[in-house]
Structures are given as structure tokens and as C-alpha cells.
Amino acid sequence: MKSEKCKVPKERTRRRCDVLPDTLHFALLTFHFSLALILLATASASAQLAPEIGYVYPSGGRAGTTVDVVLGGYDWTPDMQLFVHDPRIKLELIGPASPVLVAEPPYWFGFKARGPAWPLPREFAARLTIPADVPPGLIRWQVANANGASPPESFQVGIAPEIVEDSKRKTAQILPALPVTVAGQIRRIEEIDHYQFKVPKAGPVTIQLVARQLNSPLHAMLKVRDAEGRVVLDAADSEGRDLTLTMIAQADVPYEISLHDLDFAGDRSYVYRLTLTAGPHIRASYVAAGTRGKTHPVEFVGLGLATGSDKLESVFHDVTFPAAPDVNSLAYVLETPWGNALPFTLGVSDLWETVQPPSKESPLAVPGGRTSFIDTRFGSDQHLVTLKKGETWRIVAHARAIGSPLDLELTIFGADGKQLATTDDVPGTTDPELAFAVPADGAYRIVVTDRSGKSGSRAANYRLSVEPQREDVTLTMPTQLGIPLGTQGKLVIKAVRTGGFKGPIPLAFDRLPEGVTTAAELVIPADKNDLTIDLTCAADAPTNAALCRLTATPKIGEQIVTRPVGTILLATTMKARIKLTPEGLDDVRKVHRGSTFLAPILIERLEGYTGPITLEMTAKQQRHRQGLASEEFVVPPEALRVEYPIFVPEWMETTKTSRMILNGAVKVADPKGNVRTLLQRQELRIGILPEGALMKLSHTAGELTVAPGSEIRIPLALSRAAEFRAPVQIELIADETQTGLVAAAPITLTPEQADGALVVRLGNDPRLNGEQSFTIRAVGLKDGRWPVIAETTVLVTVRPGS
């Protein structure tokens, strides 16, 4: 069920602007002028506008299926190229772009309205084809156009049959038999999604919510109630790690899930995947990793694993770990009488792996790995090791890496109790790691401490690994790079050497975009930790992109090894053809609410371009609030100044300034004759301060209760400012749940008329039953062209027999 509560802003009066003293006025003018010059220079330096991925909806699919999806893109053009990192999967555009989309009401008012604006996407229809041999998990993808390449984002390949949320429903959506995955979207603020499910057999049911891993802004609040309304599950993803929860369900009892954002926020980008399975969820395992090629008895811990009861239980299974040297994990599926658990990831290690004994006093043989848990909240564990002088050991406490909620700290003490080393988080994770150079032969104490407060349960484990610090190298590079035609791109490769490795590091690309070349030999010199690769793009190259893989082949010891550096999307781009600047630089203009503001824009044409320009809203706005919007506007050839129409809704607050930033799109042929769309972001911003409206529409119908199939006569009153005397048409605006079920003939009020009545006819359809909110809109044209709009809302309860 979709539920939302619209907030209607109260009328606000304009604040009086006091006259400033001349000296202060001059100082402020000087400051603003200087700031404008700084912003102008900054904007000029960063004018290239590369695309970004917003979302995929539905956000994935099951292996062996083809799914029609919607791609939400920020600053996309019609000529996008799509790249999936798994070459088995096909993602293709099948339809044109939507207009730039502004988030629908309700809007934030008051303090929250001062927060950052959601990006404005365009949506593209696309088709996702996932072959049957693709394993479940996250799949990375990127996009590119003639303006650059995007960072990678992800969609998910699932394990269960999939359905899409019914966004038009009025009650909880009934889910089919488990397992099932629901692709959903919290599309508006204050929205709550509701789902209902049953199981034919009592036992554990696992609910998995994936959103943050899809780059969704959703911090989920999830609650499950039984048929009597009792809460049986309540969880909040305040840390942004997504949710996997287990409850004990009774047979044939309807349970209802409610799901919303922690802050009751919502937008098209708030996508999620909700998977329900009849079966338990493994929360921890002992061991967390097994020795390569060996069979270990593994204790699995989770709710109801042994008896199906509502308590933490454990079961033992023998697990044989893969022997292949390039396999580092095993997705293990535990079978239980209540259904299979979700796949659980076990590590595959080259160390001998053990579980810390109950006494927790036995020494750890090194090199080795040990899985344990901490007895108390914020507690510590101690591990005794014997080390020799001159050795260097790599010591890691794994928690986040194995799915544990713990946040660990690692400390080493000598035999005399003196602290020798300590570490907390390392880049990219909350797991601690250190390289310990042993100062003397003897016994050492490794202390693992939890800082999260989530220790004290066997469901929160960790793995300690101690192994010699071997010679090796880890390399990193950016995930995307744009190279303008006829120039050089600079790609910086970073190397982290460990274990004393100092040798040269040869590098090689598997491919490059057409027209892009680099040196025949790419090598990070011995003892150096970085290399800048010059990527030269020919002036006559096409604008194109390619997903390129970089591999390193250093000689470590006596063996040449292969180390993947990563994948980068390289895009050849074209120079800007225009520069847009608002007349008056960063001025703020007063604009009547509910009217169209004609914003003056200055155009500088570059590289000899004289053709038409399409102006549109840029995706990343600043102070863009409460439905401020504009449509595409075509600037004729040769024009150097235009007035761009921006509609300022009547509900915008008069106490806050708003901003609008534009893109200019032009079509230009590249050297190979391919027509590409170049996108240029406006320098500085258009400033708007809403003031009193030119027109206001109200009604005297009150709150009505009517029967299905009836007619409603709604008395209306229209107030106008003296300077606005145009005819006004009044009409009913049906929302997506009312379309085809309600109708009303529009009425027109002449400049002399101040009231009228709209007759609304209801269909005899049960889908209308309940509370309905009807929007009535009045539209007039200022100067015969520019819309002036006012709205009012009528609350109607549709009840059979009324």
C-alpha cells in the first residue's frame, strides 16, 4: 500500500527589506561582485559535464530472464553508451528519453526545505537480459557519451522469482508464495510501502532488504505485524548497510510488512529489492574461513537453525573448501527442514583455520587464522603468539569483511605488557590491519576490542589472521576518464608495496578506444609508487568509449605474477561549443508565486558554433525547492541572449530564495561524422525570491461524503491581482489512481467573473472507495503566452450507500 500525507503550506507574508547604510551596501556589492568572479572562474574550469547514473528500476532480475527496466540518468543525452562489467549480461536502450523530471509533491516545507535538492533525472526505457549461468550478486555498470564517462553503479542478480511493486494499490500488496523478490521504489516523501505474506508451514522466514548496495539513498525502516497488529519484527538501517532479518512465522497467518525511509524521505532514486524466503538466515559461522582444499566441521549460528524456535541456535555441517588457487570465497547454502538458508559466504584461506577454544587462553599457532566472538559488549579478546625477531607479520581482524556487525580495534602488547602497536580502521573498511615488525624473540599478546557495542553474542563473530608479510603489490586507478579530442589524458596509477617488494611493475591494457594510444611499454619503476600514463587522443578520432582492463605483471621472488589493477571506462570527448551565463550574474529576482519568470540568459558561442541550442534544467541543482521547474527551450541559431521561462509554483515559501541552473545542449558532428550531443552547464545561477501570487483559487465545498457513481458540485472562488486580467480555465487534475474513474468538464471564467462551479462525475467503481483528494487547477496566460497557475484541493470520502 502506498500511503502519504500531503502537507499544505500556510500562507506567509513577505519580510520587509530594510534599507542598508551606504557604506555597508557598497561593501556587500563589492563582496558579491568578487564572489561572482571567483565562481565564474571556478565554473569555467570545470565546465565539462559528464553523465552520472541515478538508478535502475526494477533494480535487477533473476538469472535466465529478460526484464524491461527504467534507467534514471543525471545529465544524460540521447546518444548514451551503456557498459556492463559482466560481458554475459546485455543492457540496451529501447526508448527515447523522458523530459527532465522534478520530484512530485508532497514537498518539504519549513526547516527541511533548506536541505540539498534531489538530482533531476531523465528516464530511459531499457531492456536487461541476464543469462542463466550468471550467479547471484551485484553487477557493476557504467555509461558514457561525448561529454565523458560515469562512475560505476550496481544492479543485482537475484535468487528468487521476481515481481514489481504495484504503486497504484490502496491496500497492502499480496505477495505470492515464497521465495519472492519485490522490486520497489519509495517515490515520494512520507510514503510507506505495505506488503502482506503467508507461509503454509510454521518456521523461520528471512527478509532481505537491498538498497544502499544499489546506490539508493534509502535508509530503510522495516516493521512486520501479525494479524492482530502486534509487532513481530522492527529494524532500522541507520548505518546504511541494508537489512537481513529473520522472524518465526506461524502457518497461514497473514503478516504485513511496512517499509519507509528513516527520515520519511522519498524520490525516484529510492529503489530497493525486498526478498522473502521460507528458511533461516545464517548470522555467523565458526570457522568464518576454511583452509583451501580441506574439509572443516563448521558451526552455523542463526535464529531457529536447529529447531525452528524463536531463539539463536546452531548446527554443525562438514564443509569441503575449494582447492583452486584463484578461489577466495564459497557461497554455501545450508539446507534445513524449514527451507534453505540464503547463500552464506565463507572465506577460502591458505592458512590453517581454527576456532578459539572456550577457555580463550590457548596460544594461536602462526601462521594461522582463528574465528572467535567477544563475550561482552564493548569487550576484548586476547590471543597469544610466539614470534621471532626480524620477522614482519600481517595481522588482520576481519569483521565487516565476513558480514559481522562489529567495529574492531587491534592492539599488540609485548611480554612486559607494553603496548607496541595499535590500529583501527583502514581505508575502505572498519576492519583493522597492521604490519608488525617483531623487535625481539618472545611471546606477544594480540588484543581485539569491539567499539560498536554489538559484541556479547555468538551471532557477532570475527576472524583473526596472522601471516608473514609477503612481497606483493596492490594497485589502484580511477574508474573513469574523459579525454578531449586532440589532447592527452593523464591516468594516475597508485601502487602499495608490501613485504619489501621494490621491483618494477609492468602494466598493460587489454584495449583502448579507437584513436587513443599510449606508450608501447608501461612500467612503474623500481622503488616508485605511482605512474602517470599519458593517453593520447588523435584530433581526428571518433567520440567513443571503451571499457578497458589494466593488468600488472610484476616479478615477485622468482615468479612473474598477474595482478588485476581494475577496469576503467575511457571516453573520448569534444570541446564545449557554448557558455551560458545569467544576466546580472548571481542576482536574485522577485517573482510572483504561481507565475512564469522569464530569466535572461547570455550566450557565448565557441569554436564557431552558430546552430540552435536546447536549454534544460541541469541534474545537480542548488537550493532547488518545492517543485520549481522549467521545460526544454530551443534557442534559435545565432541568438546571443534569450529569456528562459521558469515556472514558480504558488506554494513556494516566500521566506527562502531558490536557484535554477541550466544546461545547454547542442548537436555537433565529430571528425568521423557521428552527430553527438554536447552538454554545457550554466555558469553561476538564476536566483528567485517568491512573492505574493497573481491569482488564488479556493472552494467552499468543505469535506464531502458521497456514493460511487454520483456527481459533486464544487463552488469555486477566484481572486486576482489587478495587473492580471486574463481569462482563466478551471479543470480537474486526476492523479494516476483516479485516471479514467473521474471526469469533469472544464469551465472558463472571464476577467470579470470571480466565481463558478465545477461538476465532478465519479465512476461506479470500488477503486474509488475511501478518501480521495481531488486537485482543481486554474490556468491563465499572462501576456497571452506565459502560464499563471493556482490550485485548490477538495477532500472527498467515497462510501457505498452514502
Describe every region a protein language model picked out.
Residues 1-47:
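Intrinsic disorder/low-complexity segments
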Residues 48-103, 185-329, 334-337, 348, ...:
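Acidic, Ser/Thr/Pro-rich low-complexity intrinsically disordered segments
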Residues 48-187, 258-375, 449-456, 460-461, ...:
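Ser/Thr/Pro-rich low-complexity tracts
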Residues 55-58, 285-287, 476-480, 518-521, ...:
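Surface-exposed, proline-enriched loop/turn segments that connect beta strands in immunoglobulin-like
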Residues 66, 121, 136-138, 202, ...:
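Extracellular Ig-like/FN3 beta-sandwich strand-entry sites
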Residues 86-93, 509-520, 618-632, 733-746:
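Short, solvent-exposed loop/linker segments at beta-strand-coil boundaries, enriched for Pro/Gly
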Residues 115-120, 237-240, 248-249, 426-429, ...:
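Short proline/glycine- and polar residue-rich coil/turn motifs
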Residues 129-135, 248-252, 264, 319-326, ...:
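Short, surface-exposed loop/turn segments at beta-strand-coil junctions that are enriched for proline
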